[in-house]
Amino acid sequence: CVIVPLLMLAANLLAWLRWGTDLPMVDDWRVYDERNALSLAPARLFEAINNTLTPVGLVLDVLAQRWFGGNPLPYQTVSMLGVLGGLLWLQWRLLSWVLRRTEWAALAFAFSVFMLQSDTYWGAQNLAYHQALPLVALLAAMSLTLRGGWPAFPRVSAIFVLGVVAGLTYISGAVAAFVIGVAWTG
């Protein structure tokens, strides 16, 4: 059961490397049009794009521009392995801790195959994976909270940093509208 999601991740990766395109999609052209693909200026990082703030994601995009020269194939390959691989690893880690029996954890983990369907976060825009990064950070924080193993100060510090990363990775207009609504009624 454990091997099925891992095989699906490998199949996604191979399919992306075989049939992926190295041309940026429409949303990815904005940085070229505005000539700020390499800008780490705070005003740019905290600028709303499509009614969404993504400062951490924009930093990752700039680093990818510098390291991969704007080629989406290696960028999306690394993001796929990092995000989907991270989600799988964290899910396995949490399931094996909560369920305590390897057979049950393996059976529950097998259902994570559905999150690995093609064209979920990869194959279109480079920046689409930004939406999944908060989940990776929050699952990592949950893992540190539940499993422990670290002394209190480094663990709490890491959880705080993961919370900040999750919060600054993808802030949609809907979240901002909700917060403003709560603040006005509160």
Model-derived segments and spans:
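Transmembrane-helix motifs of polytopic, lipid-linked glycan transferases
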Residues: 80-101, 139-144
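Membrane-interface alpha helices of multi-pass inner-membrane proteins
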Residues: 154-169, 174-181
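Transmembrane-helix signature of polytopic, membrane-embedded enzymes
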Residues: 94-117, 136
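Membrane-interface transmembrane helices that cradle and orient dolichyl/undecaprenyl
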Residues: 133, 138-156
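Start-transfer (signal-anchor) and selected internal transmembrane alpha helices
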Residues: 1-11
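Short hydrophobic/aromatic helix or loop-helix immediately within or flanking a transmembrane segment
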Residues: 46-69
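Loop-to-helix entry region of an early transmembrane alpha helix in multi-pass inner-membrane enzymes
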Residues: 67-86
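Helix-to-loop transition at the C-terminal end of transmembrane segments
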Residues: 10-30, 121
